[in-house]
């Protein structure tokens, strides 16, 4: 086993280790301010990423710095607080010990907020050949791939090769898929004519595929139709009830026997929770999520919690767990703050009750679909609304 991290114990304080600085982990670290706890935040990156806008980085709409927030700047005035950039590798629950890439760390409470990664459903070929969109590195890779495709298309005299370079297939018709399709449609309309005047914008194809019968299956049918109509007006080709069988030699094979000839495939068809070694197999549920009780605790270990995308809390209203979006992560973090404080004062814990404030997906610069509990609407200034829905 590796040597211990150089973080001294603080007398009279319980050590709370938070693995992951996403929306849930960051909210917990920022808002739990108590002399009863020494907080250690662990993350693979030295900054928080505002993931909902990664698609704009990928399509050259904004720079990575606009959605990256350094942890050391956020917490520079905090006392009893430590940050370590590392990868959590294995937990030893019987010893209250966490092993990381830079050493071991003892804990009194452990919060697993490791989020999700792209799910390729066991297809290694798709993982190697397609573009994902879960972090800044992937977004920048995608941006370079898109722009390089335009450059190559401008230089080639081969019509078939140019068609492959100018065809962009997006697999997954959820929020990320429709946002990416809308952003690419805007690139075709506004960027290509100015930056690549020698290219024929009509040769650029944007194809959005989904395995279900409609886009945005988490939204109402009315919202799904509104989004589909909007994208079609922007010449986005929509193919529903289509499953990808494989991708080889620039041929994206579909279950109906057809194939799309393209060098640009974005894979945003699903996610799976990031796992942590050392926990028993029965601690995990569908999608690699950790099964938790109504207090976000792992049933076998009362001092280990999971929040956000990695937590599977089953209820009558949410038999498959809460949606893997920002709101549940932030709300679970808030409830966990209260419960950690209550636990230290001997008070009973309070169960988590999810308050759905609504959902939103943006499609281009000034268009979005929004569903609140009592009303749904479209055609609004998207960015003015998004901050309210994720807070």
Predicted regions and their residues:
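Conserved small/polar residues in nucleotide/adenosyl-binding loops
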Residues: 378-385
